[in-house]
Amino acid sequence: MAVMEVACPGTPGSAVGQQKELAKAKEKTQSLGKKQSCIFKLEAVEKSPVFCGKWEILNDVITKGTAKDGSEGGPPAISIIAQAECENSQEFSPTFSERIFIAGSQQYSQSESLDQIPNNVAHATEGKMARVCRRGKRHGKARKKRRKKRSKSLAQAGVALAKPLPRTPEQESCTIPVQEDESPLGNLYARNVSQFTKPLGGPGLGHLCFKKQDEGLRPVLPRPELHKLISPLQCLNHVWKLHHPQATGPRPHPTHPFPYSGMPHPFPFYPLEPWKPYMLDSAVLDKLAGVSGQRPLPGPPHLSQLAHGDSQKPLPGPHLESSCPSRGALEKVPVEEYLVHALQGSVSSGQAHSLASLAKTWSSGSAKLQRLGPETEDNEGVLLTEKLKPVDYEYREEVHWMTHQPRVGRGSFGEVHRMKDKQTGFQCAVKKVRLEVFRVEELVACAGLSSPRIVPLYGAVREGPWVNIFMELLEGGSLGQLIKQMGCLPEDRALYYLGQALEGLEYLHTRRILHGDVKADNVLLSSDGSRAALCDFGHALCLQPDGLGKSLLTGDYIPGTETHMAPEVVMGKPCDAKVDIWSSCCMMLHMLNGCHPWTQYFRGPLCLKIASEPPPIREIPPSCAPLTAQAIQEGLRKEPVHRASAMELRRKVGKALQEVGGLKSPWKGEYKEPRPPPQDQATCHQTLPTPPRENPPAKANTDGAPEPQPPLPPEPPEPSKAPALNLSKEESGTWEPLPLSSLDPATAKGPSFPDRRATLPELELQQLEIELFLNSLSQPFSLEEQEQILSCLSIDSLSLSDDSEKNPSKASQSSRDTLSSGVHSWNSQAEARTCSCSTALARGRPTDIPSYFNGVKVQIQSLNGEHLHIREFHRVKVGDIATGISSQIPATAFSLVTKDGQPVCYDMEVPDSGIDLQCTLAPDGSFAWTWRVKHGQLENRP
């Protein structure tokens, strides 16, 4: 209990007590000039102010305190209860009640902006009003006369008298709603109180007690150990006065008076630093700043200027640069910006929303990163589990945690390793992503998700140019790796994993999160294969609450894996959660057949085929149960409105699993050859359990009734029919006259396939290919759709991997596993070195072309200033890239250097994080080049 003592005349000392926090007020004190034989009665203070001028506020302190008779066994004294005492010895921090008594205004504040700020009175009932009780009047006539005389004398002296208040203490009489002391704001100012609790120097700034002097009391400085604060308003005013004692001149009268006009403005100390507000602090400060609506506060710079650091005029005192976000004086700063400001530059344990807020500053376009540069060794982040412990606000690789070899997986933009915390010994998976290719959606979308079908996130830390994303380690690897090991999966196990993936998608879609890249490589399995969980949110998207989707296809970014793309994605139409349903059914075809959909029938850019061809339901194995085939067809409807939702499809998959007898196949069985494509068109018709469902998107019927089917596209020819083309062996080795839209992969891996690469007629074939695409575009689509699909064609096309070329028995097993994307793509293909070096901008080169979704990112500035954005295979060499773009460079001889002009070796492999180069001239008479490309041929200086 905090107590302030006032000694009485004729007493040797004063009773033992504690002192309440006192605040500054106005100017001088006025003594009370009458002796009393016993204690001062509180009733005498009600009508007659003891203190005037600067210390007039002490009248309110005394009148709102609790007076008791101190004559029991000791010298008489007045004990004023300043603050309630907490039973558990918890330190009290100054806060506000809902109705604040305004000094000098004779009223309580009715501001609604402070209605959420609790009053930490110990063990009070939350939301209830304190009971008002008054004692009966027992005053004699003599005492009334004395009060009347004293009031008249003070009125003649020009001193305003305070309105009489209840005789009972504030805790008993004030009708102020209070809260339990367990309020989350109970220790709001405890973190910053240390910088305000130093004793103030100077006679006008300290706290006062009073001693007898002649007929009245004079103020003296108290003992320093009794110093405490009263409220945030008063303590902040103390600090400002301490730093700016000269700023005591008259202040202009504001247009909109501050409600607490009876006391100095609470936040005039703008230049004080360092003070980094925490999240809860900023919430309270926002309330205080907006206490008078959105109007500016009077006096010195108000709170918004303090937080925003945008004062219109300099204040006295040393200038200290504000570290808070800079905003306009009248603009409110979101709490999230204060939170991010507090998190930057350190690694701490926190919540998911803190990590999501901090991750937004890691994007490549962040102003802070552009200012600091990508190679800074800053270490900042948020860890979401206690098993990963930062040390001294840092969490660095090889210092606080270490990785284990070999790596778990690799994608287009990063690698996945097993890691171990050196302090706790906890092991999990870590994704190492370059800052240039990091997408903030990876963390924003999955932070805070708690579903067994979603790989949990353990935190993320930025260390220099790398972002390390920690997540649960599932020992079973990826579903794509399992398909690689088993060839193809049994129907029951494929249904089992599809059902779990749909359960995870249902969880995401109810939270308006679009995964964007559902495929077998992004489904991780437990060590026994009983649990499947979705990972890799690098292409995730938060959908709008109104349900209106947006196009995922942009000029420099295409989400997902090409073979799993929905038609609305490749055509640039608005997308919603139905995109994931299409991709999940494509993953189902991958599990049943052992290869990606579309790849058995078409070669080249698949975007056109996905947009123009019917859904790939003909790839459903004929051995599938009817309910299984029906479930796949429900998810492969071309029109999203007719496509099943995640919940609907999950129920259908569950019924199909029951139809086949449940999960009975072993977790890892014998290798089974992938299913070959149908041999003829008749077989294809027989494999469709419900043929009327295969309709083009423009003719989809809303009631689901069967409609006449259009002619099916040409089917791939049988391998035995290839010699029927009447081509000589020499011609067949020169180029392939087969229609590119129906090329069977088996025909592409014959003995003449390697010889085809070095022939000139391939250029004519490339031209015919483009003309064929243009002709097919002119029929079913509008002009806008044609332009969108043509933009996809300018990217690049698929190619057979070297593994399928070297091992024809596993050609269909190759299944384009390099078609990976995102931050965390578990590449299930063996790391065979590819010999392809062509790009989307070098179609004239007769070699295989890597997928846009797999290759590393290469950016080259041409001689005329144009930028070429290229996707290449992993481990491709710089010299091969230069040779591939030679037809696009307007120079006879050129070489490649870095952006700052440093030379690079022609045999240097492009890192997974990508590379940024520029062209430079390499004439014969120059000695600046060590290698060059001249007339399309690589030359090395001897």
Swiss-Prot record:
Gene3D superfamilies: Phosphorylase Kinase, domain 1 (3.30.200.20), Transferase(Phosphotransferase) domain 1 (1.10.510.10)
Bias (Pro residues): 707-720
Top EC group: transferase
UniProt-annotated location(s): Cytoplasm
SMART domains cross-referenced by the UniProt entry: S_TKc
GO biological process, one term: cellular response to mechanical stimulus
Region (Disordered): 136-156, 291-326, 660-756, 801-823
Gene ablation phenotype (knockout): Mice display the alymphoplasia phenotype (aly), which is characterized by systemic absence of lymph nodes and Peyer patches and disorganized splenic and thymic structures with immunodeficiency.
Record PTM text: Phosphorylation at Thr-561 is required to activate its kinase activity and 'Lys-63'-linked polyubiquitination. Phosphorylated by CHUK/IKKA leading to MAP3K14 destabilization. Autophosphorylated. Ubiquitinated. Undergoes both 'Lys-48'- and 'Lys-63'-linked polyubiquitination. 'Lys-48'-linked polyubiquitination leads to its degradation by the proteasome, while 'Lys-63'-linked polyubiquitination stabilizes and activates it.
SUPFAM superfamilies to which the protein is assigned, alphabetical: Protein kinase-like (PK-like) (SSF56112)
Catalytic residues as annotated in Swiss-Prot or TrEMBL: D517 (proton acceptor)
UniProt keyword annotation of ATP-binding present: yes
Modified residues (Phosphothreonine): T561
Domain Protein kinase residue range list: 402-657
Compositionally biased tracts (Polar residues): 809-823
PANTHER family, A to Z: MAP KINASE KINASE KINASE SSK2-RELATED-RELATED (PTHR48016), MITOGEN-ACTIVATED PROTEIN KINASE KINASE KINASE 14 (PTHR48016:SF9)
Full protein name: Mitogen-activated protein kinase kinase kinase 14
Protein source organism: Mus musculus
Gene: Map3k14
